Regions:
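Sec-dependent signal peptide recognition
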Residues: 2-8
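Hydrophobic h-region of N-terminal signal peptides that target proteins for export
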Residues: 9-18
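Extracellular/lumenal and peripheral-membrane lipid-interaction modules
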Residues: 17-187
Length: 187
């Protein structure tokens, strides 16, 4: 489950609830139940729905390690689509890597990044496709985004990109983004 959420974290944004937030505790219980069921010798069919509020509170609580440079992340869902907004310090994110390409120079300093992605999971396989990315409200052309991914993301995370396919953890068979929620099912 954390891998799926981490993939979605590449799609990021802003929130900071209190440490004992009921939404954080509810999310933790759900993740624990999913993990325990997935590790069971005889897992039972289990469907778990996580609300947008729970996901955002959990991410903001610090229980999910955001990539270096991602200062905050907030997600919203509608059927099959995840929208996110993140505050990203590109100098931290790209530390130690520079490019002579002037098109990549926009990826420096601290910016608000808005991402829209299609996300789903079926037959134990998750799929995330980044549809669009905006930097401080300005749409990033696809070819520039692909250059950024190739130069800064792929060297550290070769399995991440614009299109992502991965094995769902904990015997999760399906994952569906709905209106302000994420529902996962284990077989």
């Amino acid at each position: 489950m954390k891998l799926f959420l981490t993939s979605l974290l590449l799609i990021a944004a802003l929130a900071a609830p209190a440490a004992n937030n009921p939404a954080v505790e509810s999310m933790q219980r759900k993740l624990d139940r999913i993990q325990a069921n997935g590790e069971s010798a005889h897992p039972r069919p289990l469907t778990t729905t996580m609300t947008e509020q729970e996901v955002n509170a959990y991410v903001a609580s610090g229980r999910v390690r955001l990539p270096k440079g991602v200062q905050s992340a907030r997600f919203s869902g509608k059927p099959g689509v995840v929208d996110s907004v993140a505050r990203v310090d590109f100098d931290q994110l790209t530390a130690g890597q520079r490019s002579a390409n002037p098109l990549l120079s926009m990826f420096s300093g601290v910016h608000e990044v808005a991402i829209t992605a299609h996300a789903s999971g079926a037959q134990g396989v998750g799929h995330v496709h980044i549809d669009s990315v905006a930097l401080d409200g300005v749409q990033i052309p696809d070819f520039v985004l692909q250059m950024f991914v190739n130069h800064y993301i792929k060297p550290k995370h070769p399995n991440l990109g614009i299109d992502n396919t991965f094995q769902l953890p904990d015997r999760i068979d399906s994952a569906a983004v709905g209106n302000h929620e994420l529902t996962v099912s284990q077989k």
